[in-house]
Structures are given as structure tokens and as C-alpha cells.
């Protein structure tokens, strides 16, 4: 433990929970504030998707560890404001407020928002994981290339929707090649009857159709639909963090640092967000040498 005593962690997703767990283990007094009536952030919703129930252990383990500790106070349904933060006497403020999925089509292929007709029903993974029910045919545009597009396709098929899966990659869930899951994912979608369209991106969204752009020929084709689900990229929820100026922090003598971690800093996989929480807690009150590695490499010799 360092010289500080109290830390406020805002957000209880993977990053916030891991930061809370590690900080409390080090001996700090930690207050964890969560705006929802439950902890877990994105994992609480994603664990309910087809095939992802085991991911809930990310939350279950940390919740179990935190509940054993007396130096952690958890406040649910507590949406913290800037005024609240300045009125309390926390020495360190850690924002782990997560991210939301974009609904403008911006991702790896489309670097600018698409032209979208206002009468088209536009959805994001946050909508599908919430209480929104989609009727009829759904076009999923997957420019995320990991697991989310495919599990949402499976969820929608099981709910009775006709699903067309569009991706600019040559295969479904291309990034999943790195985890050896890709062949199983594509096989699963084919068996479910999902129509797969590869090597095409969405260039425009009309009131009753989407225009597809072939990445090789540049030819335009159209798909009739009233529902488009964008699985493209995520936007950090960092408005409260950015509302603090350096002058305000300097004027408030009790605040030693304000940091932002996890998806709120840069949206990434759950494992990275969890590590971000650990890294923040591990280095608090320490002088970090930015020019050196935070670990020692094992150099092996080859013996003939």
C-alpha cells in the first residue's frame, strides 16, 4: 500500500471490478459507484448471449472476492455527477465507465458516419441485449469481426428472425481465427440458416433497403430490409472524465489524480479491460518508468 487512503471507482464492469479488488487487497479504502442496479457492466449482458454464459465468471469471481473485504463500499443505482466528486474527499478518482456501440456505421471500413434514412430501424448490440424486440428480417453488418456479430445472429434466429450477415471480410468473425474459433462460428451460422454475404460493406442506408459495396469491383447491390443492426465499433463513455480541467484538479487540494481505464479509455476485449483495472491498482502511488517494461523477460539460451 502507498501513502494514499481513499479511492473512488466509478463503474463496475471488468475494469472497475478488478481495480476495486486489487486496490482493496493492497489496503486502500475503496468506494465503488455503479449507476445500474447490478454490477458487472457489459459482462452482465453478454453472459446471457448464446454460448457466453461462462464469461459470467469474470464478474462472479471478483464479486465474491470483494464481498469478503471490509474496506470496500458498493453503491448501486448511483449515477455520480461532477459536483458529487468534488464534494467528497477522495484522493484518487478512477473512471471505468465503459463504452456503447455506435449506430452510425463507423468502424474499420467506414471511417465516417453513413448516410442513413431516418425511417430505417437502426439497432446496435446494446439494443439487442436490452429489452428491444426486432420483428422481421434483420441485416447484420459486422465490421467488428470478433464474436459479437455471430452470437447476435444466433440470438435473433432463435427468436424467429430471418438474418442476413454482411461482412467486408472474406469469412465470418475473421478475428476469431486468432482464437481458433472461426471455423466453428461459420459452421454454426450456416447450420442456423443465416445468409452470409462476404467481401461487401454497407455504403448507404435507405428507408427500405441497404446498399452494399463490393470491396473488389466497387459494384453496388441492394438488400431489402426494414431493420439494420450495426456491429461496428464502440464509443467510450468519457464525458464526465473529460469535464474535469487540469485547473480544477489543481485547485482541489484533496484530489491527487483522476484517471480513466478500460473501455472508457479505449474499447477492447474483456481480458484487456480486466488487465487495465489490475494495472491501475498495481501502479497506484508508485513511480512508473515509462521507458522500461513492467515485467522481466525470460531470455532462454539454445544449447546444441
Task: Enumerate the predicted regions with their spans.
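SH3/SH3-like beta-barrel fold
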Residues: 210-214
Amino acid at each position: 500500500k502507498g501513502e494514499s487512503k481513499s479511492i473512488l471507482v466509478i463503474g463496475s464492469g471488468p475494469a472497475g471490478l478488478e481495480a476495486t479488488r486489487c486496490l482493496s487487497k493492497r489496503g486502500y479504502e475503496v468506494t465503488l459507484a455503479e449507476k445500474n442496479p447490478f454490477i458487472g457492466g457489459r459482462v452482465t449482458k453478454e453472459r446471457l448471449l448464446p454460448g457466453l454464459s461462462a464469461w459470467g465468471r469474470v464478474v462472479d469471481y471478483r464479486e465474491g472476492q470483494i464481498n469478503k473485504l471490509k474496506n470496500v463500499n458498493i453503491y448501486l443505482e448511483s449515477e455520480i455527477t461532477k459536483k458529487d466528486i468534488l464534494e467528497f474527499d477522495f484522493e484518487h478518482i478512477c473512471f471505468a465507465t465503459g463504452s456503447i456501440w455506435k449506430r452510425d456505421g463507423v468502424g474499420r471500413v467506414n471511417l465516417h458516419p453513413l448516410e442513413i434514412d431516418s425511417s430505417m430501424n437502426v439497432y446496435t448490440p446494446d439494443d439487442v441485449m436490452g429489452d428491444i424486440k426486432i420483428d422481421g428480417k434483420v441485416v447484420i453488418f459486422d465490421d467488428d469481426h470478433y464474436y459479437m456479430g455471430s452470437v447476435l445472429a444466433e440470438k435473433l434466429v432463435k427468436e424467429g428472425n430471418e438474418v442476413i450477415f454482411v461482412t467486408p471480410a472474406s469469412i465470418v468473425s475473421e478475428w476469431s481465427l486468432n482464437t481458433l474459433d472461426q471455423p466453428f462460428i461459420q459452421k454454426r451460422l450456416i447450420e442456423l440458416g443465416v445468409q452470409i454475404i462476404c467481401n461487401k460493406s454497407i455504403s448507404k442506408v435507405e428507408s427500405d433497403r441497404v446498399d452494399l459495396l463490393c470491396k473488389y469491383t466497387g459494384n453496388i447491390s441492394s438488400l431489402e430490409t426494414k431493420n439494420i443492426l450495426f456491429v461496428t465499433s464502440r464509443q467510450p463513455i468519457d464525458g464526465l472524465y473529460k469535464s474535469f480541467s487540469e485547473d480544477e484538479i489543481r485547485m482541489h487540494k484533496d484530489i491527487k489524480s483522476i484517471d480513466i481505464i478500460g473501455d472508457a479509455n479505449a474499447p477492447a476485449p474483456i481480458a484487456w479491460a480486466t488487465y487495465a483495472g489490475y494495472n491501475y491498482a498495481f501502479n497506484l502511488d508508485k513511480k512508473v518508468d515509462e521507458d522500461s517494461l513492467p515485467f522481466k523477460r525470460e531470455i532462454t539460451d539454445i544449447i546444441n
